[in-house]
Amino acid sequence: MTFLYITCYCVAFNRKLLVFMQMEKGKHNKGGYSSISGPQVIEKSFNDMSISCTGFGSGSGLGGLNTDTDTFTSRPKGRTSGGTTGAGKGIGMKLGNTKKTNQFLESLKAEGEVIMEDFQPCSLQSRSSPLPPSDPVTVAVEEKLNVAVKRDGGVNNFDVQGTLALLVLNDADGLILLQIESQDIPGLSFKTHPNINKDLFNSQQILGAKDPIRPFPSGQNETPLVKWRIQGMNESSLPLSVNCWPSILGNETYVNIEYEASEMFDLHSVIISIPLPALREAPRVRQIDGEWKYDSRNSVLEWSIILIDQSNRSGSMEFVVPPADPSMFYPISVGFSASNTFSNVKVTGIRPLNEGSNPPKYSQRVRLVADNYQVV
């Protein structure tokens, strides 16, 4: 009899508890607030709540886990994440929000921007840093071009400035002499570092320290040893010539741009930037050897060619804009790089100063860059 009474009591208690929980559940579904504590609430806290983390681009400093109450969202049991509607006002920014991203891109397109389709959030892009030098000695040769070409032919300025710099990782490898060679061309003049033996360089083109027991500086920074300059070069020596031919036909201006490249150089990452009058939309490109991009904010049309070599020493582009004065398409800026130089300065060998020592292994980088190259 006692056992039967206890069983009936437990059944009645469970029924009351079930009714109570259903009432509390109804309060939650209607937006009510419950102060009940106990196992049921603890279970609900862990099963029905998900933590929203903010990214690096959020407005809370460096980002990370946001512990504000508004960044927590609850899902009723039995619903999948795809069926959840509405979000807390403080939920962190979703980097994959397709709707907002598309709206942003469409607004840029309306302004005339040419949008690259492989858009990625900048906070998630990995930026690879250049690899540190692996050889004990690294030689860096670089020439920079400062050129102003007249639109009707001839040059206002054609200046070439070069530098040979040395990077030595260890002091033990700094006791060396560098044998260099260069092309004998008119207008080429050298200037050595004050700590370089000038007589040795002028007589034998050997770079060595003025104090023979003093090694070249070591570390992670390059040390310039010699500089040079080439002046008096003419238009026939230009690595790249660019001509612009605008003509007005009716209510439109047809602009033909052409380039011709010298056989002396293979040019990499060529960008020809043509200024345009203020436009309401992107210019209409009718023909192009390469690719183009329109910068609506600066009103500049960029013509890019990945590589100019023996297969494409010349190329052209044609585009159409509303009527404009021919002077609006100048100055044209040109950028490129090459793996050889005008002077052909390079290190041909390294000799250790200590007798019986082996010369350290070295690598060499040679580069020509258009620092300021314009058609005016």
From Swiss-Prot:
> What are the GO BP annotations of this UniProt entry?
endoplasmic reticulum to Golgi vesicle-mediated transport; Golgi localization; protein transport; retrograde vesicle-mediated transport, Golgi to endoplasmic reticulum
Pfam families hit by this protein: Adap_comp_sub
Q: Enumerate the residue ranges of region (Disordered).
A: 65-92
What are the record keywords, sorted? Cytoplasm, Cytoplasmic vesicle, ER-Golgi transport, Golgi apparatus, Membrane, Protein transport, Transport
Q: What is its main location?
A: cytoplasm
| InterPro entries, alphabetized | AP2_Mu_C_sf, Coatomer_dsu, MHD
From which lineage does this chain's organism come? Eukaryota, Viridiplantae, Streptophyta, Embryophyta, Tracheophyta
The protein in question is named: Coatomer subunit delta-4
One cellular component term from this protein's GO annotations in UniProt = Golgi membrane
What subcellular compartments does it reside in?
Cytoplasm; Golgi apparatus membrane; Cytoplasmic vesicle, COPI-coated vesicle membrane
Q: Which PANTHER family match?
A: COATOMER SUBUNIT DELTA
What family does the database annotate? Belongs to the adaptor complexes medium subunit family. Delta-COP subfamily.
Where does the MHD domain lie?
Answer: 134-376
The UniProt regions of compositional bias labelled Gly residues, in chain numbering, are 80-92
Query: What is the purpose of this protein?
Result: The coatomer is a cytosolic protein complex that binds to dilysine motifs and reversibly associates with Golgi non-clathrin-coated vesicles, which further mediate biosynthetic protein transport from the ER, via the Golgi up to the trans Golgi network. Coatomer complex is required for budding from Golgi membranes, and is essential for the retrograde Golgi-to-ER transport of dilysine-tagged proteins.
> Assembly and partners?
Oligomeric complex that consists of at least the alpha, beta, beta', gamma, delta, epsilon and zeta subunits.
Protein's membrane topology? Peripheral membrane protein
* Superkingdom, taxonomy of origin: Eukaryota
